[in-house]
């Protein structure tokens, strides 16, 4: 698989890191329930660093992340990541990942569809849904081919995963591990995740000139540095030496907004700067 194909076909970890959450203004921070806030965010991508054997010399791109919904109707996410990858000597490939998901507010049901394009050619397409049961989670795939399978009942969907990360950060925990299912790749994989949460940052720590810094609603809101590593569950079970498929780093606000992204694909790292942020009104439950 080429670097460009691998970059395009990996479901960006942003699906698990940039959901926006908010909490009521009253009560102790650790006792507040996590309430999701609809938002639209744009991140500009660039090559952060390369490591030995890296096959690219430049990355330029953008992520569009549009999240909506509430705990009653469920949560929808429209996601698109377009990236130009320069492998040197004038060889530039364009990857385009498009994804739409819906997750039930009760964290039991999950629907997903995605398409990966490389140089405008469709590389693969995934479509399916999953539902938690008492003994297992049932997955029904329509694409890339019809398949019905059961996955670990302990696996959580992306939104619920981030709820637990925020709850852990509020409680002062530094390590969190959960299996996560997001329907990515061929739709039949569960990823083990390891989340490392740093100390809470103050208002003057790690200042950034980005859209978050210019958002009045974020003034005085606590945030934490977070790194989430993703491991293929089947490979992790076979080997004690686990190397993540990818890892993401970001600053996570108490209300769920993420900034200062770092997408680590092992041989190269892509950074994401939050350049546009629109926080939408929360739709009340009917």
Regions flagged by a language model, labelled:
Residues 2-14:
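Bacterial N-terminal signal peptides that target proteins for export
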Residues 12-23:
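Bacterial N-terminal signal peptides
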Residues 61-68, 96-103, 128-130, 248-251:
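Hydrophobic/aromatic beta-strand elements that line small-molecule binding cavities or substrate pockets
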Residues 41-43, 61-63, 77-79, 97-99, ...:
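Hydrophobic residues positioned within well-ordered beta-strands of beta-sheet architectures
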Residues 31-37, 66-75, 102-108, 218-220, ...:
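A short, structured loop/turn motif at beta-sheet edges
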Residues 27-74, 78-92:
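N-terminal cleavable signal peptides for secretion/export
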Residues 79-131:
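Hydrophobic/aromatic-rich structural module bridging two neighboring secondary-structure elements via a short loop
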Residues 113-286:
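Mature, soluble, non-transmembrane domains
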């Amino acid at each position: 698989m080429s670097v460009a194909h691998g970059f395009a076909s990996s479901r960006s970890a942003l699906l698990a890191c940039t959901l926006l959450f908010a909490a009521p203004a009253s009560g102790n921070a650790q006792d507040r329930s996590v309430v999701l806030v609809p938002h639209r965010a744009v991140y500009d991508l660039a090559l952060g660093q390369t490591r030995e054997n890296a096959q690219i010399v430049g990355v330029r791109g953008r992520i569009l992340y549009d999240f909506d919904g509430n705990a009653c109707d469920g949560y929808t996410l429209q996601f698109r990541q377009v990236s130009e990858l320069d492998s040197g000597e004038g060889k530039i490939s364009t990857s385009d990942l498009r994804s739409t998901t819906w997750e039930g507010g009760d964290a039991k049901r999950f629907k997903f569809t995605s398409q990966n394009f490389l140089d405008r050619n469709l590389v693969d397409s995934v479509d399916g849904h999953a539902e938690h049961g008492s003994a297992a989670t049932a997955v029904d795939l329509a694409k890339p081919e019809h398949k019905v399978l059961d996955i670990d009942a302990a696996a959580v969907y992306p939104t619920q995963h981030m709820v637990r990360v925020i709850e852990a950060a509020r409680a002062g925990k530094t390590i969190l591990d959960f299996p996560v299912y997001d329907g990515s790749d061929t739709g039949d994989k569960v990823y083990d995740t390891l989340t490392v949460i740093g100390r809470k940052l103050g208002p003057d720590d790690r200042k950034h000139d980005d859209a978050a810094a210019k958002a009045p609603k974020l003034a005085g809101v606590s945030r934490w540095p977070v790194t989430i590593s993703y491991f293929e569950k089947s490979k992790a079970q076979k080997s004690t030496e686990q190397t993540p498929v990818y890892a993401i780093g970001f600053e996570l606000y108490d209300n769920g907004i993420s900034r200062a992204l770092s997408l680590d694909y092992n041989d190269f790292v892509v950074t994401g700067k939050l350049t546009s942020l629109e926080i939408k009104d929360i739709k009340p439950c009917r």
